[in-house]
A protein has these predicted regions:
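Subset of outer-membrane beta-barrel
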Residues: 35-306
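Bacterial Sec-dependent N-terminal signal peptides
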Residues: 1-37, 243, 294, 304-306
Length: 306
């Protein structure tokens, strides 16, 4: 019986590693970006999306798909796609993280492979988690979306810089109740302090949350308040504050207020802890209210080989 378990376990690890390798091979042809307006799912549903230290923190192969579109008919309004996959291998976490955003004529790319290590502190599920991602960053101007002088040499110069290697680093303390984390994204820009880099780029991210359990059985509710602090180049730093409500791990409700004077709301369902779907709506910032109608985001999470 022990022998069969080993075979099953080895087969599971092999399948998951093959899937991650396939995703890693494909991600270098995919487009993505670090963001001023992050996906709402990063706060609770998929924290690996923002912090590489969360890769492989939980059992199984976790696959997350996201799509976000601004609720507006304005030409060139932003749309975003994201996919992450992470897998736990003993104390090691492996993952791939791809984020794609197009706004107007600008398309940005960030595609990363992640290695994380989870150090147990005791038998009470307390861990110190460290993660690093490395991959490519690509930014291009789509000539078909340019309203202006197509021969402007600055456009060609911008496109000719091609893809650049970049990385993210994250750390987190996690337990059954308290989570504390910090992230330095876009390490290349952080180290080189490149003045030519455009605005709308993440500089840092930090967050703390605490889980509160109330009720038992069918009346059990887990409430997780969270505060986050983000730095974005060219903008004032942003505070996020809100909470997630988990009803018996079947129904989720969340809300976050952002100091940019916008708010995010989400609701979703979880089927047998293996398939979750959530929808999010984010109001526009104060600067855009009246000219746009906010954004809608749909997130799908599947947990395999658990």
């Amino acid at each position: 019986m022990k022998f069969n378990y080993k075979i099953d376990s080895q087969f599971k690890h092999t399948v998951c590693l093959l899937l991650l390798t396939t995703a890693l091979t494909a991600l270098f042809t995919t487009k993505a970006n670090a963001q001023l307006n992050p996906l709402s799912s990063q706060y609770f549903l998929n924290q690996y999306q923002i912090n590489p230290a969360y890769a492989g923190l939980t059992d199984g192969l976790n696959v997350n798909l996201n799509y976000r579109k601004q609720w507006s008919n304005i030409p060139g309004s932003p749309n975003t796609q994201s996919i992450t996959a992470d897998y736990k291998l003993n104390k090691v976490g492996l993952g791939v993280n791809v984020y794609n955003e197009k706004a107007g004529s600008l398309q940005r790319t960030k595609a990363m492979a992640t290695y994380a290590y989870h150090l147990p502190l005791n038998n009470d599920d307390q861990k110190l988690n460290f993660g690093a991602s490395i991959g490519i960053m690509n930014e291009r101007v789509d000539y078909s979306g340019v309203n202006g002088d197509m021969t402007d040499p600055s456009i060609a110069q911008f496109n000719n810089k091609g893809s650049l290697f970049d990385g993210d680093f994250g750390a987190a303390y996690t337990s059954k109740t308290l989570n504390v984390e910090g992230v330095i994204p876009n390490i290349r820009s952080f180290i080189k302090q490149e003045e030519e880099n455009d605005v709308d780029r993440s500089l840092f991210y930090a967050a703390v949350s605490y889980k509160i359990n109330t009720g038992t059985g069918a009346n059990a509710i887990e409430i997780e308040p969270k505060i986050a602090y983000r730095g974005i180049k060219g903008y004032d730093n942003i505070w996020d504050a809100g909470a997630n409500f988990n009803f018996t791990n079947k129904v989720f409700l969340m809300g976050m207020y952002h100091s940019s004077k916008s708010a995010s709301f989400g609701a979703g369902m979880n089927y047998k802890s293996s398939l979750a779907i959530m929808g999010f709506y984010t109001t526009e910032t104060s600067a855009l209210q009246g000219s746009a109608n906010g954004t809608f985001e749909i997130s799908l999470k599947a947990t395999l080989f658990k």
